[in-house]
Structure formats: structure tokens, C-alpha cells
Amino acid sequence: MANQEIARRRTFAIIAHQDAGKTSLTEKLLLFGGQIQVAGAVKSNKIKKTATSDWMDIEKQRGISVTTSVMEFDYHDYKINILDTPGHQDFAEDTYRTLTAVDSVIIVVDGAKGVETQTRKLMEVCRMRNTPVIIFVNKMDREAKDPFDLLDELEEELVINVRPLTWPIESGPRFKGVYNIYEQKLNLFQPSKQVVTEKVEVDIHTEDLDNHIGTPLAEKLRSELELIDGVYPEFNVDDYLKGELAPVFFGSALNNFGVQELLDCFVEIAPSPRPVQAEEREVQPEEPKFTGFVFKITANIDPNHRSCVAFCKVCSGKFTRNTPYLHVRHNKTMRFSSPTQFMAQRKTTVDEAWAGDIIGLPDNGTFKIGDTLTEGELLHFKGLPSFSPEMFKYIENADPMKTKQLNKGIDQLMDEGVAQLFVNQFNGRKIIGTVGQLQFEVIQYRLENEYNAKCRWEPLSLYKACWIESDDPAELEAFKKRKYQYMAKDRDGRDVFLADSGYVLQMAQMDFKHIKFHFTSEF
């Protein structure tokens, strides 16, 4: 029973550059899972209904995702857990952490723009973890690059072998559909349908194909399919599972075209939950005892209640409601009477969850990102880094009557990992560090709308925040004295050096040879 439940789980993230169509694809997958009746248009000028996975007010207003949302549904005999991640580069850290909680990834690429910066960075994280990748080339109903040029670009930019499993017949206004190489079926395109398009079984070597798409396109398709067989490696599931080969699908998420082929193939070939590396040992999903780690914390999923939810990935065994589990960092036992599973902000209480599932645990400040829960074993799961921010600003209270609300808001948003908080040792002022400007706007907006607190920003020109440590306590003290005005503490009380230029950092590294300067911290 346990092994069957684990084997039917598929936990994956959808990642891409901003505007490639991740959230549209998520919506259509939910449509097939029967979770929503009509998919919301993501662009803000077409608001029939906002996207299901964009649940914060700011996401609905701007038509972008600013936080990872978790959704689960059943499809055929499989239990699917989707994590829709922000594509905007300012929220990359949320996405990096999400990749530690999934077993495979679907990368969405815009057919007209090809591989973009953010996609490249996220693929590096997938490569580091040998995560299996499927690529969906989206927006084929608009003018797109030549599909062979796209395949070359994917191989070169993402450093992975590719094999198309569906193939487009033209693009833009001439787009006729895709040929499903995997199932040897022709799928004809009908725009703006919320339902599945018609599939026709055709032998591509007969006139049947010509009757459906016309002789010129049929001839072109036959020669392209021959070229594919000659140039690209045979699709091999083992190579895909090792992260060495990426199957490629073409379609249009907004028009719900090519999505079902992607989903059907995905559930068949994608891995069930994989082993997870802890500092002490490798944890196998089939182990009878429950283990899990917190990879994300979200405040105010329900704005009527100032509640936080810790997202926990079940790594092994079975989680049961109201059972005592050990919170390893605090070394204390906790019970959870209302663990939840999600459909964006709609949540339902669950009695049990298996390896591969993502559950939400109510959090009143107990959890931090990276915390481990077990049945008693002292385990620490690895690989939840926090990167040195790129931008820094002082945060000031704009309404002295709301100091308490502001402090609570900052604490909860920092728990989420939205940004990082440092306290300057020289003047005691709070500094917020982020990856991009948009995060400052999101923090200000959420403080005002969710905590009724106002803040203002004061610019601060810094180059990097470096976590420092040394085996020589005397040298560490000497460094902290000399650089006193540049020293800060992070939320865990660790020493951070705020270098205001690359030159200052270089000189510090030369003058203090026994001090280690780190650009990432483990949470």
C-alpha cells in the first residue's frame, strides 16, 4: 500500500523566464485535473478571471507571480503536485528553494524569444541536482523561431541533449497543429478552445496526412521527421531520469493546445519521489518512518486571519494528522491538528500525506526555512541556500503609531524568505537586502495591505553582503573592530560584512587572510 501510494506521486515545478507562459500552463493542467472549470487569462488587460495560482492581490493586479504557489490534483491514477514558481528575476531565490522540493521540472520556453536569462540560471540549479527536465515550447500560435533553430538553442544554452516528442506544423497564423511523434497521432489546432482538440491517427506515409493538412505541408513534415530521426538521439527514459536528455513538446498553453500530450507523457515518464540527501545520510522515500523539511513559509494565505503556513515536503514514510513529530532544530515534539493541502489559496485539511506530497503546517513563528521534522531521528536536510542580495535599502517607519505592526510585518515577510534583514552594528538601523527592485515594492505593498503599516525606503549603496567566519578568533575581532561601521548581524545573529565596493572587499580579503568570506548562507 505505502509503496503504491509513493509510486503514484509526481511532484514537479514549472519554471521559466517572466512571461513565457508558466502560469497559463499551470491553469490548463488544473483544467485537465478537473480542479477548475475555466482557466483565467493571465494578462491584466483580459481579466475574465485571474489566474488560480496567482492568489495575492499584487499578483492579480500586475499579472505576474511573485511567490511560489502549490497545487495538487488527481489525474488518471496519479497524484500530481505542481509548484508554479515566479519567473520574474527579482524572485529567483523563491524559485531556487522550490527546486529543492521537487523531483522533476517542466521548463516553459517562449517560441518567439527562445532561451532567456532566467531560464539559463534555473537550468544550472537543475543540473547541479541532476533534476529530470521536460521542455514545453509555448506560444506556437504566434510567430515563432524555426523549430530546428530552437532545438539548437536549447541544447547550446541549457547544456542538455534534446529529443522532440511532438513537432509543430508551421507557427503564427499558419499554425496547423502538432504531430505527436511519441504516439504517432496528428493533433489539429483549433484556437480558443477550453476543451481538448481533435486527435487523428494518421500514417504519415499515406495520403491521409495530405488530406488533413495539404500536400506541401505534408511533404515538409515528412522530411522534417526524417531529419529528426537522423540528428537527435532516440528517446530513452533512463537518460531523461538521469537529467541527461530533455524531451521537447510544442504547443500553446493559452489556447490549451499540446498540453494534454505533455501531461500524458509526463505522468508516464516522470520520476516518483526520489531519495533526498541529508547531512547524516540519504533518506529513501520508501522508508516506513516520516521525515520532511520546510522549504517555504507564506504569511497571510487567508487575509482575514494573520496566519503563516510552513510548506513541508514529505521525504519519506507517511505523515499522519495529530501524531507527535520531532522538530529537530528546537528538539521538541509537535502535533499538527490541521495540516492542509492546497489549490492555490483554497486549502483542505488532510489526515495523511505520503513521500512526495507537499503539506501546509500552521506556523506561529516556530519554523524557519530548512527546518526538519522526523519521528525522532536527528536529521538535517541539505541545500537551502540564501544568496547575497544585489540591492540594499534602509527601511524606516513612516507611521510611529504603527511600530508594532511594522516590526511584526517585517519579521513575517523575512520568515518567508522574501528578502533578507540585516541590522547595522554601527547605527542600529535595519537594512533590507533583495535580488531586485520589485521586491521592495512588494514588501511595501504587503506591509501596507496585510499589516496596516507604512514604511519608507532610504537608498544605500552597497556591493555585497558577505557572511564571515574564521578559525582565528583574534583576527576575527580585529577585522570587526577595523570594519565596525560596515558590520551587521543577520536574523540568526551571524556576522555579516557589508562591502560598499568590489575594491573594499578585495582589500579586506588580502589584509585578513584567515577570514572566510561567504556569498551564500545555509538557512
Language model region names:
Residues 1-523:
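Structural and coupling elements of P-loop NTPases
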